[in-house]
Amino acid sequence: MTSSGPGPRFLLLLPLLLPPAASASDRPRGRDPVNPEKLLVITVATAETEGYLRFLRSAEFFNYTVRTLGLGEEWRGGDVARTVGGGQKVRWLKKEMEKYADREDMIIMFVDSYDVILAGSPTELLKKFVQSGSRLLFSAESFCWPEWGLAEQYPEVGTGKRFLNSGGFIGFATTIHQIVRQWKYKDDDDDQLFYTRLYLDPGLREKLSLNLDHKSRIFQNLNGALDEVVLKFDRNRVRIRNVAYDTLPIVVHGNGPTKLQLNYLGNYVPNGWTPEGGCGFCNQDRRTLPGGQPPPRVFLAVFVEQPTPFLPRFLQRLLLLDYPPDRVTLFLHNNEVFHEPHIADSWPQLQDHFSAVKLVGPEEALSPGEARDMAMDLCRQDPECEFYFSLDADAVLTNLQTLRILIEENRKVIAPMLSRHGKLWSNFWGALSPDEYYARSEDYVELVQRKRVGVWNVPYISQAYVIRGDTLRMELPQRDVFSGSDTDPDMAFCKSFRDKGIFLHLSNQHEFGRLLATSRYDTEHLHPDLWQIFDNPVDWKEQYIHENYSRALEGEGIVEQPCPDVYWFPLLSEQMCDELVAEMEHYGQWSGGRHEDSRLAGGYENVPTVDIHMKQVGYEDQWLQLLRTYVGPMTESLFPGYHTKARAVMNFVVRYRPDEQPSLRPHHDSSTFTLNVALNHKGLDYEGGGCRFLRYDCVISSPRKGWALLHPGRLTHYHEGLPTTWGTRYIMVSFVDP
């Protein structure tokens, strides 16, 4: 490690006063067995960070004995993430090694903890150490830090890393004691420079048998070596392999700027996730929300920062969350004037449902970052706020237990994995580029597609996540988490947590829901959700396709045949019918029912109606997609042997009124088959109407709103529209496969 002390502080080291070193015959030989019970791992940590707990978890997996120095003490070793330092570690180790000064049979391995993972067993470690022929073996790296000028004093090596790294070393207790007892410097002086100068003394190096692990047989420092490291999967264990030297290191050290890469490796090594066992620690340290007792208080912060499809459905889902509403405070920031009517419609229900509510509207003129800072700080300042649940309006939580599940995962920060339907776009990044933007990790696709299931340490999350309230109060007390930089608010948020060493976890153990696509949401339409069949097909179907359509397609006896080869089935929801009619009336340019029609290629309509074509309102492509997706499969199930591409040139809404055009004379349609959907209710919106098929003398007099009539067109099914006697009747017609 390094810290902020000036580099040249100990250019002059005191002379070493060492007892005679072991002779060559006393040094360990490759065949000498070493008892793992004589091995002690010593590390340093001032706080039980998530990195430290990860280190302990890996040590426990292999049954290492670990002694931690410095817990609860103040760190005085400098800002080792940015400059030199770390001398405090040597001072602590010096004091500790006094206990083992005479233990010739004991082997000590010293490693950092926050950025270290153990990947092999004590037996393997000791075997490799003995094979090294050393009394003290340091890890090695490609950089001569902190003084590059010392590089020429290092012995040349044929293959491997040349320079010492102080983040890990292993040796006999007596030898380590002889080394560290020479420390007489400041806590923020540099530990690596101290060990480097001792190693560069040729006489001392030979006398004490000091060596470097040039080929990463034991220690793998990641800085400068990321291209050398790959994951090696066994059935119930994962470790790393150094492909440059064909070694299997035991200590993985994310030194320097490689913390995120270590987090990635730590998702697997040693048993984070294995092909056979799956997630190896997902069930550790969980909490259970006991029944009969009040669950933790939650601050639910909802953000509507952009025009978002299906917002009324999102607001209604808040009422359905499987969590006691009297334990939830709701904060809602709406940045869009367009959505004010939607929120106004739902706000009375939300007020009655949750224990407390706060609405911040567009009139406050808060930026997205400022709004998020405001919400998070309200939780931070409230000692009763146990969890902060941030939820963006484009996150569709179909799993109503999401909040409960995330709380029980018992992490400081955790997000549910969400992705766009059928896409790889998700609410997390598996890696970062050098400029801290998106980069795809090797396992990204497997995580999004849930081919690997577990809890993952990732560098970026957004749109939905849960944070412990005490984490905000104790570890992230500053208010400007989102708006404190020029970057995107979510990127600033994630960097704030990463810089504090707080892990950003992602769970894909459950199906939580999905994300909406919002970039092409056009609010110029009266009902813009209607246009979302391409971008958000699942949500579009839920809102606009009849709830019984799927049952009808599966042959559950819903489809009726009121006339020969005339099939009747549920297709559109009431909302779809209403919004389609509203769009047409909003457009308002009805044809007038004349034979002359400039919209047609020939300019003449033989059987004219008062209508508006889908093309006129910009809905042609969307309607054709509906035909392909929903009408085509139904047609092929009703007419076996017929395959349709669901092509249609004529797609239009017809309006019938007694004083305008009440009926339609007998005619054949210019189609292979025709789709005719009732868009409003007989008896409520109009009287009369219906359809008569003359060849069969068969009348359908009571069309059902949202139900479609499907019948052959140009040859057999000669038909007429019966008179509408009162009100206004609307139908949607498509001439399919003309």
Curated annotation (Swiss-Prot):
Mutagenesis or variant effect for residue 669 to A: Strongly decreased lysyl hydroxylase activity. No effect on glycosyltransferase activity
Ranges in coiled-coil conformation: none
Family annotation (InterPro entries): Collagen_mod_GT25, IPNS-like_FE2OG_OXY, Nucleotide-diphossugar_trans, Oxoglu/Fe-dep_dioxygenase_dom, Pro_4_hyd_alph, Procol_lys_dOase
Protein name: Multifunctional procollagen lysine hydroxylase and glycosyltransferase LH3
Keyword Endoplasmic reticulum: yes
Annotated effect of mutating residue 715 to D: No effect on dimerization, lysyl hydroxylase and glycosyltransferase activity
Cysteines paired by S-S bonds: 279-282, 379-385, 563-698
Tissue: Ubiquitous. Detected in heart, placenta and pancreas and at lower levels in lung, liver and skeletal muscle.
Pfam hit, one: 2OG-FeII_Oxy
Region of interest called Important for dimerization, as start-end residue ranges on this chain: 672-715
Region (Required for glycosyltransferase activity): 25-290
Outcome (variant: residue 715 to R): Loss of lysyl hydroxylase activity and decreased glycosyltransferase activity
Gene3D superfamilies attached to this UniProt entry: q2cbj1_9rhob like domain (2.60.120.620)
Comment on protein domains: The N-terminal domain mediates glycosyltransferase activity.
Glycosylated residues (UniProt): 63, 548
Residues given in the record as Fe cation binding sites: 667, 669, 719
SMART domains: P4Hc
Catalytic activity: L-lysyl-[collagen] + 2-oxoglutarate + O2 = (5R)-5-hydroxy-L-lysyl-[collagen] + succinate + CO2; (5R)-5-hydroxy-L-lysyl-[collagen] + UDP-alpha-D-galactose = (5R)-5-O-(beta-D-galactosyl)-5-hydroxy-L-lysyl-[collagen] + UDP + H(+); (5R)-5-O-(beta-D-galactosyl)-5-hydroxy-L-lysyl-[collagen] + UDP-alpha-D-glucose = (5R)-5-O-[alpha-D-glucosyl-(1->2)-beta-D-galactosyl]-5-hydroxy-L-lysyl-[collagen] + UDP + H(+)
Record CDD domains: GT_LH3
Membrane topology according to the record: Peripheral membrane protein
Cofactor(s), names only, from the UniProt record: Fe(2+); L-ascorbate; Mn(2+)
Regulation: Lysyl hydroxylase activity is strongly inhibited by imidazole.
Known function: Multifunctional enzyme that catalyzes a series of essential post-translational modifications on Lys residues in procollagen. Plays a redundant role in catalyzing the formation of hydroxylysine residues in -Xaa-Lys-Gly- sequences in collagens. Plays a redundant role in catalyzing the transfer of galactose onto hydroxylysine groups, giving rise to galactosyl 5-hydroxylysine. Has an essential role by catalyzing the subsequent transfer of glucose moieties, giving rise to 1,2-glucosylgalactosyl-5-hydroxylysine residues.
